[in-house]
């Protein structure tokens, strides 16, 4: 209880993350005593702490706001803002000093939840706030309508039913629920048994709480699509943050329609964004981009490992939009074309040093120093990443100078991406995602182009499409009628045809056919094995494949789950 007037600062060396706010603040009060020192009035005092998480937690507790996910209300933010005016928090990192504002402070407090949200590909309850426990009639109906839309995309497991007759909690009821739950969990001498009336009331309130779980199971179909879009988003100013409020505005209309469930418009999204925890969303997005940006400073092999780790957290939006896993890319291209492979022979674990697979003439031709590779319909950039690395190794081997630094590696890598790799995308966002995968946030030339209405052009205007591809390549290289060494990829399998029960028609055959018409040295693609039986517009394609004497290898997987989870049909890939 002693205060020393001459003191203007306290250096916190004792305690832990669990230090009580009262003890911490009592220590601070030692230096708050007004004083006149050498004729000058003490106007400011300081606390120095090398445990920033402890500081933030204590300040949040002192201001009486919750740092738990989904618990922070608008009023809490106002209270915290007023407290920070009285007691500013300044972070020192290296030579930089930054003052905390409310959003940044809450992001830091919730970082344990942020890591979990990122690791789970936004498939996590921590992403949402407790507004979902206060749904009224209109909002419940909105969720019921949303369920019908997202259910059509098959983007999630069987959705819980929203009981539109069971309204959510009012603010008062929500506080009552928290109070009763807290009382029921008390132990030891503080334990106070609930009365029968309180038990009954607790059960009633819990039933209303169930609607939150049902709503989350619906929002999941939207949420799992967000990380990939955040990863690829192109910002004019990289200091700009991606927030739940500006997220939709950063995605172009064509990409939004492609990546979001059919029927979930930007307007519908803006109606439901209030159910997301803004600090968790913003910090999770920041974390994804920070991981991708940090990879730019690594060696080529380390960067590939980091980028593919990020992709391993992304979820497949639905059965029609399958993101080819890095493992499958390695299986496919390793089995068919060879090159440098990042998995051991069983394709169960990654290797610290990529192994070389030699397929003789095929490998020598496809991964030559002057090779030209094309992917049609890139979604992630992982196919060109594999191809670029194998050509990169060829160039390093033939390099006239010693490759001894990350800068040397990047110089050769950028040359490979600029001269050897060409990519066609379906949307501007797919183009941005591919670019991010290949060169990160650095400035370097990438040969990518997106085609509006790509499937229609390939299906109905194949000759025009080929001319457009040739024009794109000649503009980038100055070479007309370029001969590609290989065309690779995993094309879209089907599109919805508007029929009953999510009826669809196959489209992968058009991508295989267009690749043949381009006449590269080699083609290697993944496709469903439904063409074996014909029908559904596949009869001509089946006849063409059966009579094609250039097919060298066909790998058949009766269990598609050996390659992709949540895909029911047989899959095969071929090289011709």
What positions do the PLM features span?
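Conserved RecA-like P-loop NTPase helicase motor core
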Residues: 2-73
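Extended charged low-complexity segments that act as oligomerization/scaffolding linkers
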Residues: 41-66, 404-424, 430-433, 447-470, ...
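Short secondary-structure boundary/capping segments
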Residues: 8-11, 27-31, 60-68, 390-392, ...
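Long, largely alpha-helical accessory region at the distal end of helicase-like NTP-driven motors
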Residues: 53-287
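Class I S-adenosyl-L-methionine
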Residues: 241-412, 422-437, 457-461
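Short, solvent-exposed loop/turn and secondary-structure capping segments
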Residues: 21-25, 59-60, 342-346, 385-388, ...
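Receiver (REC) domain switch-region micro-motif
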Residues: 1, 10, 373, 487, ...
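Signature of N6-adenine DNA methyltransferases within the class I
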Residues: 328, 381-385, 426, 431-432, ...
